[in-house]
Amino acid sequence: MAENERMYISYNNIHKLCQGVAKHILARNERPDIIIAITGGGMIPARIIRSFLKTKGQKNIPIQAIGLSLYEDLGLDNSVETIGKEVIRTQWLDFGALNQHFDSLIGKKVLIVDEVDDTRTTLHYAVSELEKEIAEQQKVLNRMSEETVISIFVLHNKDKPKRAGLPDSMMNSGRYIAAQTVPDKWLCYPWDAEDIEEHTMLAKAQGHD
């Protein structure tokens, strides 16, 4: 893959993007009750944005992780991957533990975090499956009147046709938040770098620091 087809993103840039989005969320009075990170790319942004969402007098926002796999390694070299057609659930929420320690997700503000919205397939799956399981919990616990509000935060939204959609209620109410919309290039994140100094230098050269 040619270098002009890659975008290098630095930790510094990610830190600033999370800070800006956190200010936006707090200004809208939409501080989440729980953050759900999609592994592995959503883990670091989730942890960073939680720091910026801290509010005096309130507890830290708990972070839960779900594992969803869409990319497939072609085995050609260390960087070539292809986008899979099917979402594979490798890790999911323990609703029993959530109900015991967190009073479930019912009636909560939930923020799903991932690094990139590429084809939107993974995000669609995450939202759809969470909505189904929350609806089931509402029936079991007889809490049908309580609304759970799901939002999404991604660092980057690729400007390209999507293979899947998200609820209109989310898209039309500002609950889908992309810190930046970028061209359809291969995004190189710092947590994938073998040489972080070289990676940061390349990110600076592209203005992504």
Curated annotation (Swiss-Prot):
One of its GO terms (cellular component) is cytoplasm. The keyword Phosphoprotein applies. The modification Phosphoserine is found at residue 79. It is an enzyme of class 2 (transferase). It comes from the Eukaryota. InterPro entries: PRibTrfase_dom, PRTase-like. It is found in: Cytoplasm. Gene3D superfamilies: 3.40.50.2020. Its EC number is 2.4.2.-. Keywords: Cytoplasm, Glycosyltransferase, Phosphoprotein, Purine biosynthesis, Transferase. SUPFAM superfamilies: PRTase-like. GO terms for molecular function: hypoxanthine phosphoribosyltransferase activity; xanthine phosphoribosyltransferase activity. The keyword Transferase applies. GO terms for biological process: GMP salvage; hypoxanthine metabolic process; IMP salvage; XMP salvage. Present with 721 molecules/cell in log phase SD medium. May act as a xanthine phosphoribosyltransferase involved in the synthesis of purine nucleotides. Such activity is however unclear in vivo. This is Xanthine phosphoribosyltransferase 1. The gene is XPT1.
